[in-house]
Amino acid sequence: MQKPQLLVPIIATSNGNLVHAAYFLLVGIPGLGPTIHFWLAFPLCFMYALATLGNLTIVLIIRVERRLHEPMYLFLAMLSTIDLVLSSITMPKMASLFLMGIQEIEFNICLAQMFLIHALSAVESAVLLAMAFDRFVAICHPLRHASVLTGCTVAKIGLSALTRGFVFFFPLPFILKWLSYCQTHTVTHSFCLHQDIMKLSCTDTRVNVVYGLFIILSVMGVDSLFIGFSYILILWAVLELSSRRAALKAFNTCISHLCAVLVFYVPLIGLSVVHRLGGPTSLLHVVMANTYLLLPPVVNPLVYGAKTKEICSRVLCMFSQGGK
């Protein structure tokens, strides 16, 4: 016996032609039953607590310690703030879905979540590029580092990254609102992403496809190319150093950033490739999306906390004082 499709209330626009759902239904991870989802909620809550504690700690340490008011740490504070917001946008809703089976998400809230996820991801990409530029100047032009990356310049870079991310992705919710949707409104995902909402439409989505591809190439694509080019120049400069110890010390300052870049871009590239292959949303697609959104907020504080001596020592000092 075929399982009946779950129908969702439809809202029509004033012209009576375009329709959209009152809410969408989130599936979570396709193929997994309620019991598995329930048990997955506990590691998810642990990840959220770890991401919140880790990123908040980094932001507060950099805010309090005036000696850390340098470009590298200011960019790190921006990265931690973005990760903190991104994890708060995705993880609590996922936890309610996994723990209590609350699948419903209102149409406009879904669009807002989608917009913030994509826009803040673009901002994070720009901050990672800025951090690569900081490492390039520090290693290749150390005498000019203080004059090139002043506090004012860092603030302008941060504001530009935020503006670019929000401006590029601002049209997406409106483009999705113009589409008509089918009678079934089940999103085979744990949260709302542009490509998954777009697949539910009964109308032509070529504008969405073209604009989405344009954003990926012009934002994340360009950023990743410049990051790669920066590291080619950094590697070239490091290899030209006469002392092996100096070369290792110089490159060691880049390891944390390289880890952050890999954790962000590898799942993003995988997600883009899987999506471009077309077809229904697969388990691999969902896993890649979850990795892309959930892993960086958890991993970045751990990597920077372990590899950055100033932050690590401050955290150890806080714990030692708290234990007295």
Swiss-Prot record:
<feature type="topological domain" description="Cytoplasmic">
    <location>
        <begin position="231"/>
        <end position="250"/>
    </location>
</feature>
<feature type="topological domain" description="Cytoplasmic">
    <location>
        <begin position="307"/>
        <end position="324"/>
    </location>
</feature>
<dbReference type="InterPro" id="IPR017452">
    <property type="entry name" value="GPCR_Rhodpsn_7TM"/>
</dbReference>
<feature type="transmembrane region" description="Helical; Name=4">
    <location>
        <begin position="153"/>
        <end position="173"/>
    </location>
</feature>
<feature type="topological domain" description="Cytoplasmic">
    <location>
        <begin position="134"/>
        <end position="152"/>
    </location>
</feature>
<dbReference type="InterPro" id="IPR000725">
    <property type="entry name" value="Olfact_rcpt"/>
</dbReference>
<feature type="transmembrane region" description="Helical; Name=2">
    <location>
        <begin position="68"/>
        <end position="88"/>
    </location>
</feature>
<feature type="disulfide bond">
    <location>
        <begin position="110"/>
        <end position="202"/>
    </location>
</feature>
<feature type="transmembrane region" description="Helical; Name=5">
    <location>
        <begin position="210"/>
        <end position="230"/>
    </location>
</feature>
<feature type="topological domain" description="Extracellular">
    <location>
        <begin position="174"/>
        <end position="209"/>
    </location>
</feature>
<keyword id="KW-0807">Transducer</keyword>
<feature type="transmembrane region" description="Helical; Name=3">
    <location>
        <begin position="113"/>
        <end position="133"/>
    </location>
</feature>
<feature type="topological domain" description="Extracellular">
    <location>
        <begin position="1"/>
        <end position="38"/>
    </location>
</feature>
<feature type="topological domain" description="Extracellular">
    <location>
        <begin position="89"/>
        <end position="112"/>
    </location>
</feature>
<keyword id="KW-1003">Cell membrane</keyword>
<keyword id="KW-1015">Disulfide bond</keyword>
<keyword id="KW-0812">Transmembrane</keyword>
<dbReference type="GO" id="GO:0004984">
    <property type="term" value="F:olfactory receptor activity"/>
</dbReference>
<feature type="topological domain" description="Extracellular">
    <location>
        <begin position="272"/>
        <end position="285"/>
    </location>
</feature>
<comment type="function">
    <text>Odorant receptor.</text>
</comment>
<dbReference type="InterPro" id="IPR000276">
    <property type="entry name" value="GPCR_Rhodpsn"/>
</dbReference>
<protein>
    <recommendedName>
        <fullName>Olfactory receptor 51D1</fullName>
    </recommendedName>
</protein>
<keyword id="KW-0297">G-protein coupled receptor</keyword>
<keyword id="KW-0552">Olfaction</keyword>
<dbReference type="GO" id="GO:0004930">
    <property type="term" value="F:G protein-coupled receptor activity"/>
</dbReference>
<feature type="transmembrane region" description="Helical; Name=1">
    <location>
        <begin position="39"/>
        <end position="59"/>
    </location>
</feature>
<dbReference type="InterPro" id="IPR050402">
    <property type="entry name" value="OR51/52/56-like"/>
</dbReference>
<feature type="transmembrane region" description="Helical; Name=7">
    <location>
        <begin position="286"/>
        <end position="306"/>
    </location>
</feature>
<keyword id="KW-0472">Membrane</keyword>
<feature type="transmembrane region" description="Helical; Name=6">
    <location>
        <begin position="251"/>
        <end position="271"/>
    </location>
</feature>
<dbReference type="Pfam" id="PF13853">
    <property type="entry name" value="7tm_4"/>
</dbReference>
<keyword id="KW-1133">Transmembrane helix</keyword>
<dbReference type="GO" id="GO:0005886">
    <property type="term" value="C:plasma membrane"/>
</dbReference>
<comment type="similarity">
    <text>Belongs to the G-protein coupled receptor 1 family.</text>
</comment>
<keyword id="KW-0716">Sensory transduction</keyword>
<keyword id="KW-0675">Receptor</keyword>
<feature type="topological domain" description="Cytoplasmic">
    <location>
        <begin position="60"/>
        <end position="67"/>
    </location>
</feature>
